[in-house]
């Protein structure tokens, strides 16, 4: 057991470890979000401490981003599926793969420690100085959070090197780049983004660390520094990061849509690849749209507004290509397809509010209100999370050799769909009415929408608990898969069920 799970170099075992870690972190992060919604469920205070409230907000963001979405999407699905889809016996660097995973539990431990020592890191996930400086946050909390980010960053960089090498070098002999499955492309592009953006974050937080402990003044105007420099460095990482969170989801949805529509390939495969590449590369040149309120030149604001809007073009190409793939199909509303349709609809909604926020003049008013919270939760809670749910249901029979109860899954989808929309749709109204983020209390005028939002969060968590029960039921009933009933949309379905410990011991010859 120790050999298998602690020292594993098998991509399937490491993928499973990532899934279990992500599920655990997801439960931690969801618990935090429930505390936030309980606090905001009525006017007046529940926690009685704004610092603690902001610590929970900060930890919720970090846990969900670095320890739930990224490990599940890149580590879980990436490790399991990339080698199977390209006909590789394993990842390019199996031992580095193992190290990538085992850097995450210590990283999460450091993050949770930062919440419980001293007063906690109540900086928001952006960790802006001067709030993150030693004057405003004395004690070890922010330092622990910085070390946590360093570990998570090293883990992601090692993983990125591994995925890029695997996708380039380990493909089947005659599999050309345009025949490479879209999910493999999405993970490779994600890895490229990680490789280019994380070193900048590492630089920024290292400078913050020395500002706090070694008396430097990179971000302190008293010593000739500039806090805006930190914002530029952070968002140069932060914006690609949000595309890192959603790109693997694009790949997952492409596969689900292709398989459920019963077509031989996705509509406009090459266009899909170019769209992902453009989204990834353009993600690096729009970072300052997070900073419209810091007093930038009007020409600078005009550039970042228009560049941000142009990203909507490749995103639109992807959305319409998914719809074109589904065109003419006689739908059987299987659970994975429901999640994919939910993803397409709600991700588009989130994209539209993003287009609103791209306008620098409007963003001056909407910045730091709940409109922004609603926007990014639409693309994360209903984009990334819906893609994860759809992907788990789609490939669960491949990973385990078992089947989940389809009827229950449809009910669970409905509950969760209602829950997340009820949680986040009212937040648009709160934002337009001017309710600011990161405050634990609010004027009575905002009560009704907050009550509805908190009810929605309770419905959502019911849906998540139901999903865990459905998975548990499939495991205790042990309903084995005898044959894949769906048309194989890519090579991972050619495995046994569940796949043998080692796949492709003899390399496959792929004729497409």
UniProtKB/Swiss-Prot annotation:
InterPro entries assigned = Cyt_c_oxase-like_su1_dom, Cyt_c_oxase-like_su1_sf, Cyt_C_Oxase_1, Cyt_c_Oxase_su1_BS, Cyt_c_oxase_su1_dom
Task: Recall the GO molecular function terms of this protein's record.
Answer: cytochrome-c oxidase activity; heme binding; metal ion binding
Metabolic or biological pathway: Energy metabolism; oxidative phosphorylation
* Binding locations of Ca(2+): 39, 44
Sequence positions that bind Cu cation? 239, 289-290
What's a single GO CC term here?
respiratory chain complex IV
Cell location: Mitochondrion inner membrane
The residues the record assigns to binding O2 are 243
EC assignment: the record states 7.1.1.9
Where in this chain does the entry annotate a coiled-coil region? none
Q: Which domain of life is it from?
A: Eukaryota
Listed binding positions for Fe(II)-heme a are: 60, 377
Q: A single GO BP annotation from the record?
A: electron transport coupled proton transport
Keywords of this protein's UniProt record, alphabetized?
Calcium, Copper, Electron transport, Heme, Iron, Magnesium, Membrane, Metal-binding, Mitochondrion, Mitochondrion inner membrane, Respiratory chain, Translocase, Transmembrane, Transmembrane helix, Transport
Catalyzed reactions: 4 Fe(II)-[cytochrome c] + O2 + 8 H(+)(in) = 4 Fe(III)-[cytochrome c] + 2 H2O + 4 H(+)(out)
Binding positions for Mg(2+) per the UniProt entry: 367-368
The residues joined by the cross-link 1'-histidyl-3'-tyrosine (His-Tyr) are 239-243
Residues engaged in binding heme a3: 375
Q: How is the cofactor bound?
A: Binds 2 heme A groups non-covalently per subunit. Binds a copper B center.
Which purpose does this protein serve, as stated in its record? Answer: Component of the cytochrome c oxidase, the last enzyme in the mitochondrial electron transport chain which drives oxidative phosphorylation. The respiratory chain contains 3 multisubunit complexes succinate dehydrogenase (complex II, CII), ubiquinol-cytochrome c oxidoreductase (cytochrome b-c1 complex, complex III, CIII) and cytochrome c oxidase (complex IV, CIV), that cooperate to transfer electrons derived from NADH and succinate to molecular oxygen, creating an electrochemical gradient over the inner membrane that drives transmembrane transport and the ATP synthase.
Tell me the subunit arrangement.
Answer: Component of the cytochrome c oxidase (complex IV, CIV), a multisubunit enzyme composed of a catalytic core of 3 subunits and several supernumerary subunits. The complex exists as a monomer or a dimer and forms supercomplexes (SCs) in the inner mitochondrial membrane with ubiquinol-cytochrome c oxidoreductase (cytochrome b-c1 complex, complex III, CIII).
The entry sums up its family as follows: Belongs to the heme-copper respiratory oxidase family.
Query: What is this protein called in UniProt?
Result: Cytochrome c oxidase subunit 1
**Species, as recorded:** Locusta migratoria (Migratory locust)
């Amino acid at each position: 057991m120790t050999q298998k799970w602690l020292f594993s170099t098998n991509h399937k075992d490491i993928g499973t470890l990532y899934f279990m870690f992500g599920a655990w972190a997801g439960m931690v992060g969801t618990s935090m979000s429930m505390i936030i919604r309980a606090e905001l469920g009525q006017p007046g205070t529940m926690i009685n401490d704004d610092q603690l409230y902001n610590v929970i907000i900060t930890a919720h963001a970090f846990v969900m981003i670095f320890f739930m979405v990224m490990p599940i999407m890149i580590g879980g699905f990436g490790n399991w599926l990339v080698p199977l889809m390209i006909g590789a016996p394993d990842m390019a660097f199996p031992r580095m793969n193992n190290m990538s995973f085992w850097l995450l539990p210590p990283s999460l431990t450091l993050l949770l420690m930062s919440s419980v020592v001293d007063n906690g890191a109540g900086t928001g996930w952006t960790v802006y100085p001067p709030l993150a400086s030693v004057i405003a946050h004395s004690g070890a909390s922010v330092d622990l959070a910085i070390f946590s980010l360093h570990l998570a960053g090293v883990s992601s960089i090692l993983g990125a090197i591994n995925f890029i090498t695997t996708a380039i070098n380990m493909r089947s002999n005659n599999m050309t780049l345009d025949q490479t499955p879209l999910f493999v492309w999405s993970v490779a592009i994600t890895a490229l983004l990680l490789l280019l953006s994380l070193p900048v974050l590492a630089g920024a937080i290292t400078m913050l660390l020395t500002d706090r402990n070694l008396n430097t003044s990179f971000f302190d105007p008293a010593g000739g520094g500039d806090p805006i420099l930190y914002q530029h460095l952070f968002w140069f990482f932060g914006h690609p990061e949000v595309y890192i969170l959603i790109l693997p989801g694009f790949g997952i949805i492409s596969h689900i849509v292709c398989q459920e529509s019963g077509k031989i390939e996705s509509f406009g495969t090459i266009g899909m690849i170019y769209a992902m590449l453009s989204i990834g590369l353009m993600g690096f040149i729009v970072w300052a749209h997070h900073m419209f309120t810091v007093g930038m030149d009007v020409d600078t604001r005009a550039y970042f507004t228009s560049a941000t809007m142009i990203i909507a073009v490749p995103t639109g190409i992807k959305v319409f290509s998914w719809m074109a793939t589904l065109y003419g199909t006689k739908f059987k509303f299987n659970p994975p397809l429901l999640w994919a349709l939910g993803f397409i609809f709600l991700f588009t909604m989130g994209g539209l509010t993003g287009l609103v926020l791209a306008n620098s003049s409007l963003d001056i008013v909407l910045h730091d209100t709940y409109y922004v919270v609603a926007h990014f939760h639409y693309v994360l809670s209903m984009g990334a999370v819906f893609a994860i749910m759809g992907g788990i249901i789609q490939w669960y029979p491949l990973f385990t050799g078992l089947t989940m109860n389809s009827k229950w899954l449809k009910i669970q989808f409905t509950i969760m769909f209602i829950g997340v929309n009820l949680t986040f749709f009212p937040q648009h109204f709160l934002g337009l009415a001017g309710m600011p983020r990161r405050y634990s209390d609010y004027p009575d005028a905002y009560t009704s929408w907050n009550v509805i939002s908190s009810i929605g969060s309770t419905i959502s968590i019911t849906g998540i608990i139901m999903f865990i029960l459905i998975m548990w039921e499939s495991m205790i009933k042990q309903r084995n898969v005898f044959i894949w009933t769906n048309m194989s949309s890519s090579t991972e379905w050619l495995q046994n069920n569940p796949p043998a410990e080692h796949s492709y011991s003899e390399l496959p010859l792929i004729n497409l």
